[in-house]
Amino acid sequence: MTADDGGAVPGPDGRPRCPWGLSADDYIAYHDDEWGRAVHGDDALFERLCLEAFQSGLSWITILRRREGFRTAFAGFRIAEVARFTDADAVRLLADPGIIRNRAKIDATLANARLLAEWPEGELDRFIWSYAPDPATRPAPRTLSDVPAVTDASTALSKALKKRGLRFIGPTTAYALMQACGLVDDHLSDCFARGAG
């Protein structure tokens, strides 16, 4: 997101939305139906973790428009299946035009799946959600400039995930994950989706 001096902006249907959520039809649907809504389940959180890592250095719309390609390429982000991917699968992924073909990000995804496959069922969900800050301590942002890129909680989550062996999850990526999965509600105070998580 970029800084902006205004609040929510009316969309095509007249409902006020965060300004970033109006730049493309894909963004409108993502903003309205997904971003900031609670995501639970190890595989669902693994998908979001992977997509946020692939987004690093790119625009989110690039990832959003390739999400189905990612889901197909990475076996629906089912941790147990991705953990069994071989070197041949890595080569296949590097040739797949439906995803971002970045060797470091692909390798990190496969390594993270192998590591997470060893965790007890539900552990990733519990672990990530244990870093959700108390909503009462976070005022609703009025403008996009009020929305941070990194917080103490995202820095702590990033460090904790790295300590447990996960790769490609810095504090900014961790905060984007927290926003996308509803750990924090960064919809603007006058956005219709505020509090829908």
For each predicted feature, which ranges?
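HhH-family (HhH-GPD) DNA N-glycosylase catalytic core used in base-excision repair
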Residues: M1-G197
